[in-house]
Design a protein with these regions (language model features):
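Aromatic-patch recognition
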Residues: 40, 47-166
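Bacterial Sec-dependent N-terminal signal peptides
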Residues: 1-14, 205
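A short, solvent-exposed beta-edge/loop patch
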Residues: 141-204, 211
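Sec-dependent signal peptide cleavage junction
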Residues: 10-38
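Solvent-exposed, flexible loop/coil residues
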Residues: 35, 43, 66, 198
Length: 211
């Protein structure tokens, strides 16, 4: 018989039977002629999922497809995606740990409220990261062979007072967000070795300035 097992973390997750999830089988698109992977992490990874209806699940087989911005999972050897809308998910990248993604943010550029963003910091003034993939084509001089590769791009967005804006993370853009905290930022940069291209460093800066 089906049973529930509690999993205690920052929020309460439950390991529910797969039959509880409304899922839709999908046929995986094979990019056999493209070098690289369309996924955030090529292997199946453990993670947690929160649906918009509030239900939470823990999985051993999640992958995030960056080409179509969809979260997929394996059930009985078949690839599925969630028929019910996903609000947030957490996935282990096997390197830095768990990465948390959410949607429902304001539409910006060519992105809409269904687009997933990695949460770098979600304090009052937040920072989010969009990871995207596209296919680029190239060929060597004198060759008719076209080489296709997946190209990964990273974009950062700030959320302040309901306004979602693309930024380049650096001292100038951060000061523009935290207008009255130039002294605090200067003190922080003097005492800490900061790499503005490092997500962990950016998270710490935003946490510090949001105090």
């Amino acid at each position: 018989c089906a049973f529930l097992m509690p999993f205690v973390a920052k929020a309460q997750y439950e390991i529910l039977p797969f039959g509880d999830v409304i899922r839709t089988p999908i046929k995986e698109k094979k990019y056999t002629d493209v070098e690289g992977t369309p996924y955030l992490i090529d292997k199946w990874s453990k993670g947690k999922v929160t649906l918009k209806n509030g239900k939470r699940y823990q999985y051993d087989s999640l992958r995030y497809n960056l080409m179509d911005d969809k979260l997929v999972f394996i059930d009985a050897g078949k690839m599925m995606h969630f028929a019910e809308p996903v609000a947030e998910f957490e996935i282990n990248d096997g390197k830095t740990g768990n990465l948390i993604y959410k949607n429902g943010l304001p539409a910006v550029d060519a992105l809409n409220t269904s687009s997933f963003f990695q949460i770098i910091n979600r304090d009052k003034i937040g920072l989010y990261k969009k990871v995207s993939k596209s296919i680029t084509e190239s060929k060597q001089y004198g060759s008719a062979v076209v080489n296709k590769t997946f190209n990964t791009t990273y974009s950062y967005y700030s959320l302040k007072n309901g306004i979602f804006s693309k930024i380049v993370p650096n001292k100038k853009s951060i000061l523009a967000l935290f207008e009255n905290k130039e002294n605090q930022l200067n003190e922080y940069l003097k005492s800490q070795k900061v790499d503005f291209k490092n997500d962990a460093d950016l998270e710490k800066i935003f946490t510090y300035l949001n105090k």
